């Protein structure tokens, strides 16, 4: 893989992570391809969810992989109660080993989300994010100064494009229970559909955000506080912002930036809106003051 696009203070750690992913992504794919990979275990993770077998196997593999990095002092999986720490290193990695596990049995797109933090697990310390999606092909998307998309082919990641969102998209991925949507959100969605937007929601956050990014615009929303800040929300918020989109939530009817949020507990959750500029403007118009 050609790493010349990665520059700046945090380029080296990103390159090291990508190099490990390039070597290990086939192993990850093998874990997902096992016949019983989507079977539920009898366990409960720290968030109260019941993980599937692939969750735990992939988690173990990724934890060992990331801990092998000399400059990583802490590794934290969504499946664990607390981080695993080492004595030395400057960076911390928080990751969701298998986002979309609930739809894996239907053979939908799933993926791994990775957030790279410096010194502490805070949104303000998030310096890069990555995700890998597993489908009929494997893709890697990396956010550092810009957002780069790669496809895995013949044991290497090959550059596809730099992702920049357009002002206005054509797809929406609106997650959550619609009966609990606010009146403003319902009106915003009705307006999008009236403008011939297409609904593209799969139940896998990484897949739906990937779709918005690849199509160069649109909106992902999850208004209920269900998504975990450190492992899902912050990394994908950075991804969308670096692609010239907006990542926000509403606090008593006031639109606020997701990456300005604090973290009171490791597994704290948040509502989440990720959008290109036009969709962000429409959402603010309808949800402002609610």
Swiss-Prot record:
> What gene is this protein a product of?
fbp
Tree of life domain = Bacteria
Any keyword Phosphoprotein? no
**Name assigned to this protein:** Fructose-1,6-bisphosphatase class 1
Q: Which residues bind substrate?
A: 99-102, 201, 226
> Where, per UniProt, does this protein localize?
Cytoplasm
Question: What catalytic activity does the UniProt entry give for this protein?
Answer: beta-D-fructose 1,6-bisphosphate + H2O = beta-D-fructose 6-phosphate + phosphate
Give the Enzyme Commission number: 3.1.3.11
Provide this UniProt record's keywords sorted from A to Z. Answer: Carbohydrate metabolism, Cytoplasm, Hydrolase, Magnesium, Metal-binding
Q: Give any Gene Ontology cellular component.
A: cytosol
